[in-house]
Amino acid sequence: MKLLVVFSLSILLFVVPTSAQEKHEAMKPVNITEISVEVEGGKTVKMKAADLAKLTRKEIKAKDHDGVEALFSGYELRDIIAPAGAKLGKDLKGPMIAQYLVVEAADGYHAVFSVTELDPDFTDKVVILGDKRDGKPLENWQIIATNEKKHARWVRQVTALKVRLAH
């Protein structure tokens, strides 16, 4: 019996580092060249940096994961999802209030925002797809959300923005 326990523990010692290593591998920088913007009932648009550059840049001050204040710049999510058909402004009423945005990352991480959280008619909160911090380029696009106590929705390596309607 003791031999079985020792054998089982020794296997765990070899398995755990592999799992941690796999997790670390998934966090390595990737070169993301476009973001897919998809709106249920609308269309799917592929946006590259040149497409985003046509939008109005927004700068916001926010504290990063370590609590250090920085100046982030990028593009408001509402400006990115609107061309694909997301309902905002005067059209964000009735059943459209149930729209939500799923942010997807290269490593499989997901976060969700209500579309009302992105609309200035509903909130003063600002959520951007950031590409710079203190004037220096970020490795990949990242979600930056003001006034968040936790940074669980600060998705890194963003690959897709998908607007859905809760039914």
Which functions belong to the PLM regions below?
Residues 21-167:
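N-terminal intrinsically disordered, low-complexity segments enriched in P/E/S/T
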Residues 5-15:
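Bacterial N-terminal signal peptides
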Residues 16-20:
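Sec/Tat signal peptide C-region and signal peptidase I cleavage site
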